[in-house]
Every structure is written in C-alpha cells, then in structure tokens.
Curated annotation (Swiss-Prot):
Belongs to the novirhabdovirus protein P family. Residues 20-62 are annotated as: Disordered. Residues 40-61 have a biased composition (Basic and acidic residues). Phosphorylated. InterPro entries: Rhabdo_M1. It comes from the Viruses. GO terms for cellular component: host cell cytoplasm. This is Phosphoprotein. Keywords: Host cytoplasm, Phosphoprotein, Viral RNA replication. Essential component of the RNA polymerase transcription and replication complex. Binds the viral ribonucleocapsid and positions the L polymerase on the template. It is found in: Host cytoplasm. Its main location: host cell.
Length: 230
C-alpha cells in the first residue's frame, strides 16, 4: 500500500466516523448495527446487566463442602468474608465441644478411679475373709483327723485321777445300794475299809466305774464281809 492509498483509506467522512463510533460503543446484534446509531447516549434505555452466577461447576472442583455450601447462597465477592466468619464460628464450636468432652472424660475417669478403689478394697476384704475361712477349715480338718485316728489319744494324768475319784464314789455307792436291795444290808454295815480298798483297786484296774468287773468285785467283797460277820 502506498502513502497515498493510506491517506485515502484513513480520510473518512463525518458520517463514516459516527458509524464507526457507534459500532465500537453499541453491542452488535447478529452482525448488524442498531437501528439508530446516532441516538444520544442519555436517550438510550439502560441495558440490564447479566446476572452473575454464584456457582459454577468448573469452579467448585477442589472446594471444601463448606465452601460449596457458601457459594450456593452467597455472592462470590462475599465468599471470602463468609468463609472467614463461618470458619471462626466452627472453630469456636469445636473448642467448646472439645472442652465439654474433656470435662466429661475427666468426670468419667474420676468415677472409674473411685470404683476401682472400692473394688480393690472389697477384694482385700474378701481375701481376708477367705483366709479366715481357710484357717478354720484347716483347723476343723486337723481335729477330725485327730479324732478319727486309729491310735488312742493319750489322756492327761490329772484328768484320769479326777475321773477315777469321781467314778469310784459313784460306783461304790451304786454297788452298795444294789446289794442293799437284794440282801437288805445298808451301805454303812457293808462299807468296811477292806471293801473300800478292794473297790479302789478294781476301779484302778478297769479305769472306769461302770464295768461288770467292778460291780462284781465290790459285791463279792460285801458278801465275804457279811459271811465273816455271821
């Protein structure tokens, strides 16, 4: 293109300039210029601004659930402020919940420690009672073994003497009373020293006063004493 042709290309008429300005300022409609491009700006009707979409599927990728929820109801320009406010609220709720859970766990731990101490004390008492019962059972078993032993249990000498003295008195009076009923002899008449000595020897030999040998020896001695007196 030569210089002359360039000057001729940019040498525009006034009508051409208006048409060009109108094309630059007015949106095109199917490739056509508006009906009245020379209309004044103040006479033109205000055009509605396109509504801003608050949620775009391509922008929601990689967002958290809270961010997606906020984008659903809040304008995109206010999302950052909303996220900050909601984040602070959630942090406060989380701290309050954590403090409540900590207090609850401490209370439960205290109750468990008290229950454990009570259980330990109860176990100690049960162990003490069990030891006492075991000792009693061992003592009873030892006594049963001693009483059922095939070997006779030795007697205390003092107990033997006391039993013999008591047995002799009872046996001697019983023998004399029996003989008195048969022969009509009183204990005073038949109770000489010789008869008493013989009864003592018989009691010492038999070690108890209720044996047939004891009564027989006492009665025989009384008979002999009566014969001597006749």
């Amino acid at each position: 293109m030569s210089d002359g042709e360039g000057e001729q290309f940019f040498n525009l008429e006034g009508e051409d300039i208006l048409r060009l300005e109108s094309r630059l300022k007015t949106p095109r409609n199917d490739g056509q210029i508006g009906k009245n491009p020379r209309r004044r700006k103040e006479d033109q009707a205000p055009q509605e601004e396109p509504k801003k979409t608050t949620r775009r599927p391509d922008k929601n990728k990689g967002l958290s659930q809270l961010e997606q929820l906020i984008l659903k109801y809040v304008e995109e320009e206010s999302c950052q402020d909303a996220l900050k406010d909601f984040g602070g609220l959630i942090a406060n709720i989380r701290q309050a919940h954590q403090a409540e859970m900590t207090s609850h766990l401490e209370k439960v731990a205290t109750e468990h420690r008290a229950n454990l101490q009570a259980l330990t004390k109860s176990q100690q008492e049960h162990e003490k009672v069990s030891k006492e019962i075991l000792s009693a059972v061992i003592a009873i078993r030892s006594n049963l073994n001693e009483n059922h032993s095939p070997l006779p249990k030795p007697l205390d000498p003092d107990q033997v003497k006391a039993a013999r003295a008591l047995g002799f008195g009872i046996g001697y009076r019983t023998a004399l009373n029996v003989f008195d009923r048969i022969k009509g002899v009183t204990p005073d008449n038949a109770g000489s020293q010789e008869v008493k000595n013989l009864a003592i020897r018989a009691a010492e030999e038999d070690e108890y006063e209720g044996s047939p040998t004891f009564f027989r020896k006492v009665i025989d001695a009384v008979k002999k004493r009566m014969k001597q007196g006749q």
